Amino acid sequence: MGKKRTKGKTVPIDDSSETLEPVCRHIRKGLEQGNLKKALVNVEWNICQDCKTDNKVKDKAEEETEEKPSVWLCLKCGHQGCGRNSQEQHALKHYLTPRSEPHCLVLSLDNWSVWCYVCDNEVQYCSSNQLGQVVDYVRKQASITTPKPAEKDNGNIELENKKLEKESKNEQEREKKENMAKENPPMNSPCQITVKGLSNLGNTCFFNAVMQNLSQTPVLRELLKEVKMSGTIVKIEPPDLALTEPLEINLEPPGPLTLAMSQFLNEMQETKKGVVTPKELFSQVCKKAVRFKGYQQQDSQELLRYLLDGMRAEEHQRVSKGILKAFGNSTEKLDEELKNKVKDYEKKKSMPSFVDRIFGGELTSMIMCDQCRTVSLVHESFLDLSLPVLDDQSGKKSVNDKNLKKTVEDEDQDSEEEKDNDSYIKERSDIPSGTSKHLQKKAKKQAKKQAKNQRRQQKIQGKVLHLNDICTIDHPEDSEYEAEMSLQGEVNIKSNHISQEGVMHKEYCVNQKDLNGQAKMIESVTDNQKSTEEVDMKNINMDNDLEVLTSSPTRNLNGAYLTEGSNGEVDISNGFKNLNLNAALHPDEINIEILNDSHTPGTKVYEVVNEDPETAFCTLANREVFNTDECSIQHCLYQFTRNEKLRDANKLLCEVCTRRQCNGPKANIKGERKHVYTNAKKQMLISLAPPVLTLHLKRFQQAGFNLRKVNKHIKFPEILDLAPFCTLKCKNVAEENTRVLYSLYGVVEHSGTMRSGHYTAYAKARTANSHLSNLVLHGDIPQDFEMESKGQWFHISDTHVQAVPTTKVLNSQAYLLFYERIL
């Protein structure tokens, strides 16, 4: 009877709390306290029993480069096995062994978290219940029990001697650093610069590596202090010119993810703790993105994007709620007039979020018609740049895929350009670089057939074929739209107050619904094949940066979103007449904003300018120097911002040339005038240099049906000049300056393979850059350059922190690079 009574009880849940997890139903069957106490008598802690019997402990301990896997304790029988991040996965195999009763509950001996294999989720516990009492008992036994000297074998003695030698070396290095710090005290830092280790919560090395670099970003810590200030008042200029007084709004406290981030950065600056456990911050990230739950191997760049997007979304929500309170209406039901007013004020936000102020930059895509030489610009923001990494094998194959139908004169003129073009376009398209020639030819034929069908359909229905060549950017950075993709492939835009101004690269498009962890279907339109494919995000493992080739939805100029027909074409006939490459326009600049009152604001701004064609594609410095060295980060930036030719199926629909052919502008009646497609020139350059530049090297690629990692070493400098990749009118750059310098302060390195790898971080402990802080906080642009701040590099692998020379950092296999602006 007692069991029935306890079985029927339910745990009271507070609706206001977000931290409570669902109660595991397998605790009673997976927990055996009597067997556990017997098994923990005279046991060696934190050692996998199966690896020890296989004589693999000694071999793994001798390798300094390989990290020791986490050990999990079975709460049913006391078996100790290595976790999922190890090669053997003995703890998982122990659970999968058929038995009469399940051995599904395991306890991590590193961070004392409980995991249920049946639920495939973490089990929450407290000290009052049975599970919490068992965990407390195991922790006491682990702290009390110590191995006796007589029981130690020769192998363990050798291991302890090696550990003592390492500890003595570390102490000597620390003494040297302390002496150097005494001789050269920091000038601008009132507090001591510290680098601490981070506890691995279970395959969270991808998270720890990114957090180490963010903790060495002083500007982020300063802005978070400003955001946390209570009673912050923000003034927003009125959207209507008739209203002269700005709207004053009182901001609420920041969201839980932002508060957890601020708490984590403050904890990293404390000098008392040697190792920090970022459990609260990681749990908040998992609430924004459910894919990070489960302690699986994940991707660092994906984690960084979700983290920044989550904090930015919370900041936009603060502003939206403040605007509603300023109008005296905080209810969810609003009339249409008030809704429009709120959205107008949201668009007029004078101060961007702290994420955009630190990591935000701007890209400008320029397209020029070869006949009328009219220039059109597309501006969009970004948080990081995903750069292509070309493998030697893919580069050789792509060179052989040149079009053999070209004349000899064209080959002589464009041979070098076509080699780069083919290799780069192939890397961006959905045709894998490692596929056979037969599949590649078949894909090209299919693309040509679809292009012909689209041309025929366009003549019949008066549709336009290549708006994507004008209105979207073919590079791996695309504006992030808060879009909800339905299973039928239709694009439904959520009416939300959150302004998504970030950029997601085309291979991996994340929207706000991803942050809520809801699986969905995404319909993608690739650039080369113009075909549609549906990708089930729920069934795809995104570990280790497996990229999904998707593109963000495209809007036309009237605010209507472009939907796909049954034949895969894009219906953009309505509203295209508003976008014209009209060289006869008198104003120098016309902004064509793709905003609609009923939708969330986007970040792309289209404009047609009367700009000199000779200087439109010029950069602040010479860029041709970096076209030779293919193994450098400068060459990756060169490929990312390279000049492209829009020809053949990618021709530009030029309204100026169309009007000239029709002898002047006339009313566009269907079937009366013929559209003119011309060759065009296209290039993407940086038009706003971010204070903190984040570069992502796309090392993980798909070759046929297999996944591979490009282990090629990419050289990256300690001082990077971004001027060869910036426009002449680059913002945040003084008029006479021809250099845009950045200093390296953080690296995320991935070692291993696609299936089993490890992330580590290189971070530079240094003094804060005062000029950079003034730029971010106050917008001051100094005329002269500040010297690079000196500091000490550290290599951090979870809890292990070691000082390293600069040469070791520059020789690492970088996956993410963090640069700060030198001003």
From Swiss-Prot:
E.C. numbers: 3.4.19.12
Biased composition regions of type Basic residues, renumbered to the chain: 438-458
Record's compositionally biased regions (Acidic residues): 409-420
GO terms classed as biological process: cell division; DNA damage response; mitotic nuclear division; monoubiquitinated protein deubiquitination; positive regulation of DNA-templated transcription; positive regulation of ribosome biogenesis; positive regulation of transcription by RNA polymerase II; positive regulation of translational elongation
Active site feature: C205 (nucleophile), H758 (proton acceptor)
GO terms for MF: cysteine-type deubiquitinase activity; cysteine-type endopeptidase activity; histone binding; histone H2A deubiquitinase activity; ribosomal small subunit binding; transcription coactivator activity; ubiquitin binding; zinc ion binding
Binding site for Zn(2+) 3: C74, C77, H94, H103
Chain positions covered by the region annotation Disordered: 146-189, 394-460
Tissue spec: Present in all the tissues examined including fetal brain, lung, liver, kidney, and adult heart, brain, placenta, lung, liver, skeletal muscle, kidney and pancreas.
Gene symbol of the encoding locus: USP16
Disease: A chromosomal aberration involving USP16 is a cause of Chronic myelomonocytic leukemia. Inversion inv(21) (q21;q22) with RUNX1/AML1.
Crosslink site: Glycyl lysine isopeptide (Lys-Gly) (interchain with G-Cter in SUMO2): K140
Protein name according to UniProt: Ubiquitin carboxyl-terminal hydrolase 16
Residues with PTM Phosphoserine: S189, S415, S531, S552
Entry's localization field: Nucleus; Cytoplasm
Record comment regarding domains: The UBP-type zinc finger binds 3 zinc ions that form a pair of cross-braced ring fingers encapsulated within a third zinc finger in the primary structure. It recognizes the C-terminal tail of free ubiquitin.
Record's miscellaneous remark: USP16 may contribute to somatic stem cell defects observed in Down syndrome. USP16 is triplicated in Down syndrome and its overexpression may contribute to proliferation defects in stem cells. Reduction of USP16 levels results in increased proliferation capacity of Down syndrome fibroblasts.
Protein species of origin: Homo sapiens
